Amino acid sequence: MPSSKNSPQSHLKESVVSESQPSSAGNTRSSVARMLDILDLFTPTTTKVQVDEVGQLLGVGRSTSYRYFQELCDSGLLVQQGKGWYTLGSRVIELEQLLQLSDPLLNAGKTVMTDMLDICQNRTLLLCTLFKDRVLCIHQIGPDHITHNNEKMPIYRGRGSALPLFQGAGSQIILAHLVPHQIRSMYLLRQDEITAAGLGTSWKEFRTNLTMIRKQGFVTTVGKLNPRVLALAVPINNYAGQITGSLLLLCNNTNTEREHVLNLIPRLKSECQRISELKLDFIRRQDLVVNNKLF
């Protein structure tokens, strides 16, 4: 597997190097955590991994590497497809189904977004959430493509897609609402990516841009892969005011369509509030079920 600065392999190397060092409490990164790092190597372009190469990336011996893979196979998270080659296993499908039933944001979002199909004529609406250092699309309504002058433009950021934290409206609106120490840590670790995304060439400029986004209450961007696609995102906060996700609307990048979707911002913000309320209600109902079972 070729490695580059921004590849999953390079991030895994950085993780192993930094997180294997003793922490302030004197702990080291556990073998379980190192084993689970293997799952981070799977991407849309890397759908199988080789045991020998992973052993080198993890900095462990051949026997340890094989043991990690065997344990992941025993759990159903991986399956061997050939000599030394592994892909994701069937347990992942089972977990995905359980996630559909149990995730509060997903269930609340699906309920609300069902009532928003009226704004999805030649537009796609996505529900996004923060996952580690990236943003994940977890639900989608509307078409899989947007038509522009009789040309069908595919939506590249559909359900299950991971978006870079600094690129795109759905990500930037979440980034702007992170707590200050998270934003500061992001800047210290990812200055090059922040600059490349046009979010600032200094800490002061970066912080100022995020403050402006928060005050504005929404973000619009033009597609990096297709500049004829316009993206508009608004934040979803929980009952405590903390960011929990975003609603991302994709449409044609024309003056007329831009005006139309900007007029939809109050509606989108109202629906985000509904998602937050339904999410809290879903959590309370889950707690009630658990308590009734336990007591």
Task: Name the predicted role of every residue range.
Residues 2-102, 106, 273, 277-281:
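N-terminal helix-turn-helix
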Residues 41, 57, 108-119, 126, ...:
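Amphipathic alpha-helical regulatory segments at dimerization interfaces
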Residues 190-193, 271-295:
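Cysteine/selenocysteine-centered motifs that mediate thiol-based redox chemistry or coordinate metal-sulfur cofactors
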Residues 162-165, 262-282:
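Short, solvent-exposed cationic patches
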Residues 78-79, 128, 236:
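A structural signal for short hydrophobic beta-strand segments in well-ordered beta-sheet cores
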Residues 3-5, 12-14, 149-225, 295:
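Short, solvent-exposed recognition segments
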Residues 88-189:
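Amphipathic alpha-helical effector-binding/dimerization core
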Residues 196-272, 291-295:
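Extended hydrophobic
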